[in-house]
Each structure stands twice: as structure tokens, then as C-alpha cells.
Amino acid sequence: MMRATSVRALALFGALQATFSDVHPYCDQIVQSSDDAIKKGLPGREGAKHCARHVATYTAGQAVATFAVTAALGYRLPLRALAAGTAVNAVTHYVIDRREPFKRFLRSRFIGKGGYLAHATVQRREGVVDEGGPGTALMEMDQATHRLIGVAASLLTTYLAIRSQD
């Protein structure tokens, strides 16, 4: 027989994971401004500014959606738990979207995706190869990594929320 705490944890994890996963594309693609999408990977302060602004809007959207879903389901998610899960997504989102650290990680011996990054590119304008936009390996791995991290963020949020009730 499953304990009531386990049932609550599984239900909360499912709700959080569905929310984090399904809200992600909206916040990452639609809420993000075109300017930030184009410039967030630029080197230096300019890129950092655009990436930070994108992560701020992404994080706000995710937090509002998470609060709305859990409240609609009659669950009061502890602020500490919501903040922790949201912070995991925000910090990692910034690192991934700055591009160069993520590309170094993907090209590392540990991951070994340099060939895939070089192979799956697109040409949007004659003579200009894009390695990071829609239709590229980098974009696919960016989205896959964000979603994987969303699982960890959901788990952390659930753990902290359930623990605060015990």
C-alpha cells in the first residue's frame, strides 16, 4: 500500500513536470523577444544583457504558470520550493542560452557531439551558415537539455514542498 505522502509527491511531481515541460516552449520561444533571441548568444555585455532579459521573462512565465496550475488544483506550493525549482531552471537556462559554454560542453570528450553540431546546420541567407537557430543540432540539444533540467527542477520542487509538510 502506498503512503499518502508518496501519492501527494507523485501527483505534485506530475503536475510540476507537465507545467515545466509544456510551458517551456511558450516561454522560451513566444515570450522571448526577437531581439533577445538574436542577440543572447553574442559575446560580452551585449549578449549577457539580452540573455538575462530572456531568462527573466522565461522565469516569470514559468513561475506564474506553476503557481496558477498548483493553485487551480488546490495545492499551496511553498514559496521556498517554487523558488528553488525556478532558480534551477533560470540559472541553467542562462548558461545554456549564452551558447559558448553549452557548445564547449557538447563538444567535450564527455558528450562528444561536435560532429553533430557541425553537421546539422542551416543556411538562411546565401553564404551564411547558422549553427544555432531553428533546425540545427544546437537548437535540438538546447531544447532537450532544458527539458531534462526541468525534470530535476520538478523533482527538487516536489521534494522541498513535501518535506515542508512533514
Show where each model-derived region lies.
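Short amphipathic, positively biased membrane-proximal segments
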Residues: M1-D166
